[in-house]
């Protein structure tokens, strides 16, 4: 069963293939020059389900009569490379388990976008569709939109049932318009090539190679889930008909959730500890997916009446939350959060998965000031944005170190931006050490995100007295 590209722990075979690819790039000056500035690379393990001469779903021939005057297709040589057989795109470390009766596994490699201005690099699968970017010149915003529409009509992809559809149609079926660059990520390139050549996908992973970008949190060697904006609708279509693991984030069963713990309750409010993996408040309905139970739902049942949210906590994060029992109490508590009169502190385990970074000594304190903004094409990820980002400030203190290269830290946010602590820990201009278990920002694999809301202090909405709650977390 193929792992879900939107939430996964990379298979050992994928990790080894990625390391082999990175080593090959490091040892090849021409490749190192192409990728040194930073690039998302993809690895797909496949089984040859058909003989090399029995290729199904061969790429369609496009008619140049459909090409607008301002655009042209790639060269005939490039087109032949797109329609060529499988040779040249497999890792030399192929596995052959004929003695055990298993089919041999092979690895396909791809990169996102262009490398050195080219869509073709020897040893990597070709793009879904090729054109010469320099030949496409938009003369007006309307012309630009028409060219974009035309291009996405040419991007014909296949799914596991052998069906074909253009990228524009796939997004239109969902009431969406494909963002620029859709179809150029590594994962859709890999799946397209495999499905066109009778190969069965076994495992997939995307990892970053090279320098970290200024805005996004990307660490060389770290694996990341497929993006949601460009690849969400596209991969959902391409994976139809394949045996794919369900997204564990869409099911409470994955988390084996413990019940929340109520820490305090009176007629105005209730304070509880949320377990990791539970939604703080109900999420948006997803067609075909059963709604997940949130802490707000659980507390409503516990109290026998609705409770009202006053703040948020990431699904992956555990710890203290306060809910109001009346609109008046909710307004008073929310005002404290908005005026930053609520005191909060978190505990986290952080590390450098590569093992190359030196850890700060216990007792080290510091302040991280990095403005944050949404990554619009990969929600819910956030990125550092000095131009449009909102101010975000976090104090940190290193409490102790572990022999395995992890550090236990206290984090005190003075602003409440989405994923603030996760980005401030992981970004190269922040702590530079992602939180362990952070699947979005390159943390070392773990059963859960090692982040816990351990301290919460506010004034009671009715009588104004200061209320302070503390919670320890072993992260067992």
Would you name each region that the model predicts?
Residues 1-476:
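RNA pseudouridine synthases
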């Amino acid at each position: 069963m193929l792992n879900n590209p939107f939430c996964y722990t990379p298979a050992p075979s994928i990790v080894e293939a990625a390391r082999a690819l990175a080593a090959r790039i490091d040892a090849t000056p021409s490749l190192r020059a192409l990728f040194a500035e930073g690039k998302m690379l993809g690895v797909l393990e496949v089984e040859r389900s058909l003989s090399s001469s029995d290729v199904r779903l061969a790429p369609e021939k496009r008619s140049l009569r459909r090409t607008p005057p301002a655009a042209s297709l790639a060269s005939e040589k490039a087109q032949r490379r797109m329609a060529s057989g499988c040779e040249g795109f497999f890792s030399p470390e192929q596995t052959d388990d004929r003695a055990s009766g298993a089919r041999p596994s092979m690895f396909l490699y791809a990169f996102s976008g262009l490398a050195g201005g080219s869509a073709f690099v020897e040893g990597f699968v070709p793009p879904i569709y090729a054109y010469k970017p320099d030949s496409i010149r938009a003369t007006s915003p309307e012309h630009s939109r028409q060219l974009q529409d035309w291009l996405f009509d040419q991007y014909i992809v296949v799914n596991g049932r052998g069906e074909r559809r253009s990228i524009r149609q796939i997004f239109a079926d969902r009431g969406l318009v494909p963002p620029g660059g859709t179809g150029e990520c590594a994962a859709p390139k890999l799946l397209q090539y495999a499905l066109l050549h009778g190969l069965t996908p076994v495992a997939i992973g995307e990892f970053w190679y090279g320098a970290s970008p200024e805005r996004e949190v990307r660490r060389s060697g770290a694996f990341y889930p497929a993006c949601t904006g460009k690849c969400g609708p596209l991969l959902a279509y391409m994976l139809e008909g394949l045996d794919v693991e369900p997204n564990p984030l869409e099911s409470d069963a994955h988390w084996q959730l413990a019940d929340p713990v109520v820490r305090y309750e009176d007629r105005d409010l209730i304070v509880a500890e949320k377990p990791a993996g539970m939604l703080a408040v109900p999420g948006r309905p997803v067609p075909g997916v059963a709604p997940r139970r949130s802490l707000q739902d659980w507390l409503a049942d516990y109290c026998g009446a609705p409770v009202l949210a006053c703040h948020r906590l990431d699904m992956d994060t555990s710890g203290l939350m306060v809910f109001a029992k009346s609109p008046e109490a909710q307004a008073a508590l929310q005002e404290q959060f908005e005026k930053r009169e609520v005191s909060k502190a978190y505990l986290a385990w952080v590390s450098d998965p590569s093992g190359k970074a030196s850890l700060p000594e216990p007792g080290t304190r510091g302040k991280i000031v990095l403005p944050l903004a949404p990554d619009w094409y990969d929600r819910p990820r956030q990125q550092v944005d000095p131009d449009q980002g909102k101010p975000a400030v976090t104090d940190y203190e290193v409490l102790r170190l572990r022999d395995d290269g992890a550090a236990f830290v206290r984090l005190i946010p003075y602003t409440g931006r989405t994923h603030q602590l996760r980005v401030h820990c992981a970004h190269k201009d922040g702590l530079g050490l992602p939180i362990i278990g952070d699947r979005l920002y390159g943390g070392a694999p773990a059963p859960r995100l090692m982040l816990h809301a351990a301290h919460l202090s506010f004034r009671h909405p009715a009588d104004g007295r200061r209320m302070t709650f503390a919670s320890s977390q072993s992260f067992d």
